[in-house]
Amino acid sequence: MALAAELAPGAARLGIRGTVDMNPGHAFFHRRPDRSVDEADLATRAPKLAEFIATACASYGIANQPVAVGFSNGAIMAAALLMTQPDLLAGAILFRPLLPFSSEPQYRLDGTPVLIVDGAKDTRRSPGDGLQLARQLRHAGAAVTYHLLPVGHAVTAEDSAIGSGWLQVLDL
């Protein structure tokens, strides 16, 4: 939530914790022993999360579509939501993502703004993971902005500045 507050100080925020107990921490979906995405689990969990987000927005009187902000596992889930629930989000900021699904998105994302920020020294991702996702989302029609920073996996002040500036330009 601290990152979301930095990115959009005056915006309403909904903090969501994944339901998968990772001990320590939580995730939005299971990973295989080799750390690859369990696509079947992700495909099952994404619609449930989408329903939760829609219900929460309605309950709190949030009329505008939300912009997802996700880091790592959360960025992968946010990308999955874009690909499977195209009317849910107004856009997304994805820090250190990778492809949620090996297949192309099944829906069009015509003009949906997406910011992807990768870390060149990220040892938890393979080089080009974020670029692959950017290509896939662009192919589906999303308006993708991509940045590669000389950093590792952790979110930095530069990430926050890029995300905040991107949101201000979009004025969502």
Where are these regions (language model features)?
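Primarily recognizes the serine-hydrolase "nucleophile elbow" in alpha/beta-hydrolase
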Residues: Q65-D110
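Short, proline-enriched alpha-helix->beta-strand connector loops that line the catalytic pocket
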Residues: N64, L109-V114, A140-A142
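Alpha/beta-hydrolase-fold catalytic nucleophile elbow
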Residues: R17, V69, F95-R96, V117, ...
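C-terminal catalytic histidine-bearing segment of alpha/beta-hydrolase fold enzymes
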Residues: L131-L172
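Serine-hydrolase catalytic machinery in alpha/beta-hydrolase-like enzymes
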Residues: M1-N64
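Short beta-strand/loop motif that positions the catalytic acidic residue
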Residues: L115-D118, D122
